[in-house]
């Protein structure tokens, strides 16, 4: 009788080899999960950090995924595409992300406010840098690309931007810029009574400002509207006053004649009176300095009061 005895040691070794433990490799680098990009370091997702992957910069926010569109990071706004790549580059340019358009510099930071770009188009970007599209703002219409309609309102805006740029600088305070705009209107406008605006027409204050700034001439309404347009351009909210002051030009029985000046924050500014020398020193004064009547006050920005 033959008896078979198992080699116990060899069997144990064979069993161990067949059930060897598989070691899972920890994630490192960029991974796309459920439509969002994440970055792993030693198997853990990172957050609130910049990372560069294959030459493209990403920012992984507080929820771990790469942020997209516009985001404020350490006090600055940056624009990213829909994959989370920072839209930086060699020069400033218009970029499109989804339905939004931005004008970003080489660091991916968008411009805000009014923009007159090298394509000869006027745009307006909100506080996040998004272009206004298919809407009207301050009587200027924007199309689906964010471009302003080419009309008198656009022409006035570009004219004001140019005058302010040529007569002020970034080191000036807001009040210093206002004085520079005042000096420009007073010194560069000659009096002409050939044109009186129709105060019943819509946007007469803007068309009058454009006429005066464009021709360098105007009556009291022209001076007032031109100064109000420039004041608005540097951030004030002026009113054009349509009133009457003592005078004989209109031949009215009560001894008053038509006149126009500007109110800013309740203070009076009379550029035509200054330029012509008949009522000087009315610059930011709490009182007008002579008796007057007010027919209406028109907010230059909104048109309220017209």
Regions found by a protein language model. Give the residues of each.
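Extracellular adhesion/carbohydrate-binding repeat motifs centered on closely spaced tryptophans
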Residues: 1-155, 249-265, 273, 292
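Non-catalytic ligand/cofactor/substrate-binding and regulatory segments of enzyme domains
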Residues: 150-160, 181, 288-295
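Secondary-structure boundary elements
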Residues: 155-212
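Hydrophobic/aromatic-rich core segments of domains that either
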Residues: 222-291
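Low-complexity, Gly/Ser/Thr/Pro-rich intrinsically disordered linker/tail segments
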Residues: 282-306
